[in-house]
């Protein structure tokens, strides 16, 4: 019964903390414990959750997991202290009421098994009674009292040694007091300073950390990216980083708390013990705790930015139905070419040498013109790596000789080389060279960014900030969640999807994804969703979790094309029948007209299906193959080129946001280097974070603010330059 009550109390805390209703929190936890996935709950259990989205559901589950860990630790600490016979009712209550793991550890600290410290050695020498006597603040002279504790057998040779031992005991007592540590932690964070100085300037060849060579900032004001920059500089042995606490204020606080009689002769010795206790035992551990907390906050921010950037990258609109010529640029080894048809099938692989040192420019031009004509190429995708701008100039020249309308686009090729050398790429294209696979990947990225990018480790897609300096476990969890959410929001064509894409579908493991592809290759395309029940290791629960996200576009049942879950098929058929329609009318204009006239609340009462689910069903019936990505702005198509020398201050340009960081956004305006729009130039209004204004893949209007031709840098502004 106590466990049930405790769960309910924790849920109430969660409700208060996150601002959701008790019903929402309870249902999310219950549904998860029953084996339902986050995408499934978000999509198909809206009535239960009050239409919470994936991010909100995850926030509840993460906080709940922390609370469970906290409760487990409390129980363990209570047991450990109890076994020592030192658990009082008051201490038990303090532990039970703790809301953070740090508070529990502070309370447990005095009872922890300690390695031999100065205090434990002093206690072994029988000096604890002297320490207790000093804290009574009697009128007697401590030096005289200490004589009683001289003991050659216990290696206490003098009164001074006895007093020193007693002070060591008092110092540890102060260090172990949870309320003191908590106050010191808070005041250090509120009034302390983050300081960095140069340690190994010769190692900082590019002067990356120059601003931190002599740097101070209040702890409360240090922004996440500076915390991570200083951490990295310290790790590389270039910087010396420390926390400077308000020492005098802390010592005054401890003196007032511990010394009850300043006139007593004991006060002097206790004061020395206080200073030693703080400087030797508390200061450095509080500094570690604060820096750990700052780092964790900074990591969360870096992971959040990376996750948002990745989400926007994955959800870029696909270029459907286009034959694409993809170019993976290079100098010496030549530009690799691939032509992929509108389904992503590879039609042609080639190589050209338009650049030095080989430079067969005319041959390259003739070959590209021939390819465009032969395969009726509609779009050219150029990777943005080495030799990208020179290749762009070459393609612009080629396009001047092309009669039909062909556009080109610069594609972010980050991670393409990682993918092309992977086992997955070797499996997919066993007969292609690494660079040829890379060219195919670039072309397919343009056609369907999501389907192609899931094949790459999310950390390699080039939209992170300090991703190598954060907790890799936490980063992987967050990025996997982003990919899963994107894949399930879009839905997957089960007859064309790769294992890499299928493994992110709600409920599916990599093994089951492989089994689906193997079955498809063996027996041909799936014609209805129910056929997936025959897949090895795809049981009833897995089927329930995954099937709504898997689409069969040319199947026997038109509902299998939609995001409607089969559990609702009977209700859908009854709904259509009541309107004089059938499932064969799905996606037809007459069905759209009739459904738009439907009164949702009335229909909900008649069918017993919740309103949010009904809205989703009607949307799916009207637009069965709707892709949420189609509603986003299309990538920026190009026909001409810009050079750095062409730019003038105040020039208005259109560009694509390539990366968003704490201090601004990098925008590709068609010159060699992406230009930086500093956070201060994003909007006339105050901008808390660049992500509030821009996102990866977004097309933005910018003005040239400053050009540094020497360093090849461009400063841009989203505010008109006067």
Residue ranges of predicted features:
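Long, charge-rich intrinsically disordered scaffolds of nucleic-acid metabolism proteins
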Residues: 103, 409, 415, 420-490, ...
